Design a protein with these regions (language model features):
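Core residues of folded domains in eukaryotic genome-function proteins
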Residues: 85-89, 93-97
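Glycine-centered motif in EGF-like
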Residues: 1-84, 88, 107-387
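Conserved beta-strand elements of beta-rich interaction domains across eukaryotes
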Residues: 94-98, 104-108, 256
Length: 387
């Protein structure tokens, strides 16, 4: 910047980027762009003024540094699905959704503008704001380190750690995806149980570990950053079929500590199967859903064996882990009928046959999306248990 002959200020054009550049965030769902971040507005009202051009250069420099640090971090996140190619960073959120980040001109339009929707614009904007806040926080951390006494001199070159920019975003998106999937599973399962006349319910507390209202001595921005870096945890609890039977589930996603990623834990309270517990830690939501489905099946088998209306045959759980029950005749003591119970996410079936499998005495199927009126589970059991 220098003075012209008339005393006005002149900014050397060679020092100012020819175009404003920004980080563009796009969200894809099933190979279709469903969200794009909005361009960052300049702080100056007049882009042609000296002040406006200086602010443009500052913003472009910030965006270029941000993209450089994003690429630097993305190179160590290959095992988590993050890939870089030329001027593009992309990573999957779920099987259907992925996020793409690139450094583009502010006035550049997307190549897929004709197919774009705006369903996930808010998500794209949130990711863009998050990575900018995290870079600013990293600058603050660098300033703090420079004010501290330097470490002892060493011949080893000190490695500059990658900034935490993508990892907190990855963890949040991954945790949110796992929580939404598990909650949809519970919704289907409990809708199925209620369609069979079972009185039970569940409670979901997504992001139970996040408490931004808690008062601390830190500024609000740092409190937000500390909440982003902390492990994310969501909890679920619910009642089952038999009295006093219940479950608790916890989904935990870690940012910094080991193990990095999402783990599922299930805790069962089943008085009739107190010796059986779920695996300590499961990495996949499908595994946790399969374990919980099996425990619900065990509880339904226990409820059927405890249900003994007057004048009906009593059922005993012969092979509870396979959903099989047998009934005996009160007069002869011989086994008369066999019941096979199967349970899936959207369907529950009870089939009763002779002990030797010679014929089917009755069968009933309940579905989570059924609309027609059907007998309840215990009504069907009582009906097929008549002598």
């Amino acid at each position: 910047m220098r003075r012209a002959d008339d005393g006005s200020l002149i900014l050397d054009k060679g020092l100012v980027p020819s175009k404003t550049r920004r980080i563009r965030v796009r969200v894809k769902m099933n190979d279709k762009v469903t969200g794009t971040s909005n361009p960052v507005k300049s702080a100056s009202s007049d882009d042609e003024s000296i002040e406006g051009r200086i602010l443009q250069a500052r913003d472009t420099l910030f965006e270029e540094e941000l993209f450089y640090e994003l690429v630097r971090e993305a190179r160590i996140l290959g095992p988590y699905g993050v890939s870089t190619r030329q001027n593009l960073i992309r990573f999957p959120v779920s099987e259907e959704q992925e996020v793409m980040l690139d450094l583009a001109d502010a006035d550049q339009e997307s190549d897929e503008a004709t197919d774009e929707s705006h369903e996930h614009d808010v998500l794209a904007d949130s990711i863009g704001h998050s990575i900018r806040i995290l870079l600013t926080f990293s600058h603050r951390q660098n300033l703090y380190r420079r004010t501290q006494p330097p470490p002892p001199l060493s011949q080893r070159r000190r490695h500059t750690p990658e900034y935490l920019l993508l990892r907190p975003v990855l963890v949040y998106l991954q945790h949110n995806s796992h929580v939404r999937w598990f909650e949809s599973f519970l919704k289907d399962m409990y809708r199925l149980l209620k369609s069979a006349g079972v009185d039970c319910d569940y409670t979901a507390t997504p992001f139970a570990s996040v408490d931004l209202q808690h008062k601390t001595r830190f500024p609000k921005v740092e409190t937000l950053i500390h909440a982003i870096f902390a492990p994310l945890e969501s909890t679920f609890s619910g009642t089952l079929v038999t009295p006093k039977s219940s479950f608790k589930a916890r989904i935990r996603t870690n940012v910094l500590g080991h193990p990095f990623g999402t783990n599922h834990e299930i805790f069962m309270n089943m008085p009739h199967h107190s010796d059986i517990q779920a695996p300590a830690r499961m990495g996949l939501g499908h595994e946790a859903a399969a374990v919980l489905t099996h425990f619900i099946m065990l509880d339904v088998v226990s409820a059927i064996s405890l249900h003994r209306p007057q004048g009906c045959l009593a059922w005993e759980a012969a092979y509870p882990h396979h959903g099989e029950l047998l009934t005996t005749s009160p007069t002869t003591g011989g086994q008369k009928k066999k019941m096979k119970f199967t349970l899936a996410r959207n369907e529950m079936t009870v089939q009763v046959s002779g002990i030797r499998g010679t014929g089917v005495d009755g069968s009933q199927t309940w579905k989570s999306d059924q609309t027609s009126q059907q007998p309840s589970l215990m009504e069907f059991v009582a009906d097929v248990s008549k002598e």
